[in-house]
Amino acid sequence: MSAGHDYTSPDLARSALVLIDVQNDFVSGPSQVDGTGERVPAMARLLAAFRAAHRPIVHIVRLYVPGGSDADPPRRAAIESGKQIAAPHTDGAAVPGELLAHPLDYDSLLAGGVQHVAAGEVVMFKPRWSAFYRTALEEHLRDLAVNTVVVAGCNLPNCPRATLFDASERDFRAALVTDATSQVTPERLADLALIGVETLTTADVEQFFEAAATSQERQ
C-alpha cells in the first residue's frame, strides 16, 4: 500500500529564509529576549549559506511608532504612554550590523513597502505576530516560486511560531532552524511538529547547499 506523497519535508532548493525580529532592542537592548544575542552567530552563518546559494532572504522587522495606536494589544498601552520599543529611526530598531549592513528605510517600510537591500534580499515590516499578516510576504514568495519557508530569529513562541502556522495554512512547506532561533523548547517543537513543521540546524542547511554546489560543479 502506498504511503502517499510527502507534502511537508523541506525542499531547500526552492526555499526562502525568513529571519524574524532580529533587531538591536530585542538582541541586547531594554526589550531583549533571552538567548537571542547568543544565537546571532548562527544566524550570520545561516544568512551566509542562503546568500552563497543565491536563495531568497526576507528580513522581517517590528516597528513601534512612539505614541502610536497601531500596536499589538499587549504592548499598546506601553507604546501610547511613551515607551520606546524598536522605534523607527533609532538604533534599537536596526538589524545588527553583522546580519545586515544596509540601513533600514523606515518610512517606506511603515508604508508597506518592500525594501530591497541586495540581490534576492529584502526587508519587510510586520505590524503583528505573523510575518504574513498585512505584508507582501506571500505574494513575494509566490513570485519567486518558493515552496519552503525556512524560519529563524527571535522568540519562537511569538512571531516565529505565528509565522510557521501561517506558512502551513498557505500550503508552504515549513522548517525551523533551531540553533538560530531563541526561546526554543521541546514543548514548542512538539506543537510545531503536529502541523508538519520540520526542524533543521544551521549545519544541516550549510551541508545541503554545499553538496548542491558541489554536484552542480561536477555536471
Please place each PLM-identified region on the residue numbering.
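Active-site alpha/beta core segments
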Residues: 41-144
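Short Gly/Thr/Asp-enriched flexible loops that form oxyanion-binding sites at enzyme active sites
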Residues: 160-170
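A charged, well-structured terminal subsegment
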Residues: 198-219
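Short amphipathic alpha-helices and their capping/turn segments at secondary-structure boundaries
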Residues: 2-16, 44-52
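A short glycine-rich beta-strand->turn/loop micro-motif centered on a GG-aromatic cluster
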Residues: 148-154, 171-186
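Active-site-proximal loop->helix
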Residues: 183-197
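Short glycine-enriched, charge-decorated loop/helix-capping segments at active-site entrances
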Residues: 30-37
